[in-house]
């Protein structure tokens, strides 16, 4: 306690010499922090008698108050000086000639999303939205992917807790829409989805569009013609399209869709996978309270960045997210 006044004086001198906010904060920690030299004086109270402690405690608090007041005053001065310096540096010379504005443009992913939505809108599809933070039921269970199902491993899911996650696809929007209404349905569900993956063709966040049609007397032939027509209109040319048998828990039968994209070195057709599709599984209808004996449906899903890469000739998916103006200006 006998050197308290000296500590206060040292602190005030240090505050006065501080010429920037970082140095001032270091002084605050040194003198008033949890292990600060003035704060530590409180430990000496235990050595004093009960009669001496109140007065000693008051002195320590007054000492802390003095230094704290000086720090606050110095901080205000430094912040004011910083603002004045910045304003002086940013002063405008009104005699300089004017500069034209550099107009922006839509991001290529936004352009692609809008193009997809416009194509399906002409076919009578509505655009439905849903939450990006989903529950396990709508993201997996209601899509015929129970907890023990190995297909869950394909999704590389970001979990908040065992029952809450970032959606891995936009299919939950279809479930929520079917739960809230009655068939027939004709919808697309665009939006951001999340999976723990990152390389030249994958990012942890990307965009999907998933479509659903539920009506009476729907067949795989209807699905096939819808997909083929969409791809023809999107790429603005006739394409050879191939449907390969595949597996998705929420559709049966299921298929992967490939398009002809150039030629292999041996002259054979080079096929590129662009989307997945299938007939809605009866179990999914059961979860949504729809009679699968009366109604049938088909679903499809596609990656927006994937189609944007093909349409614009982009080789690396990550370029869409790097905010490089040299890249983005090409799409205005």
From Swiss-Prot:
Gene3D superfamilies, per the entry: Bira Bifunctional Protein, Domain 2
Any one GO CC term of the record: cytoplasm
Chief localisation class: cytoplasm
Keywords carried by this UniProt record: Aminoacyl-tRNA synthetase, ATP-binding, Cytoplasm, Ligase, Magnesium, Metal-binding, Nucleotide-binding, Protein biosynthesis
Family matches, as SUPFAM superfamilies: Class II aaRS and biotin synthetases (SSF55681), tRNA-binding arm (SSF46589)
Record bears the keyword DNA damage: no
UniProt similarity note: Belongs to the class-II aminoacyl-tRNA synthetase family. Phe-tRNA synthetase alpha subunit type 1 subfamily.
Oligomeric and partner information: Tetramer of two alpha and two beta subunits.
HAMAP family, alphabetized: Phe_tRNA_synth_alpha1
Protein name: Phenylalanine--tRNA ligase alpha subunit
Species the sequence originates in: Marinobacter nauticus (strain ATCC 700491 / DSM 11845 / VT8) (Marinobacter aquaeolei)
Gene this chain is encoded by: pheS
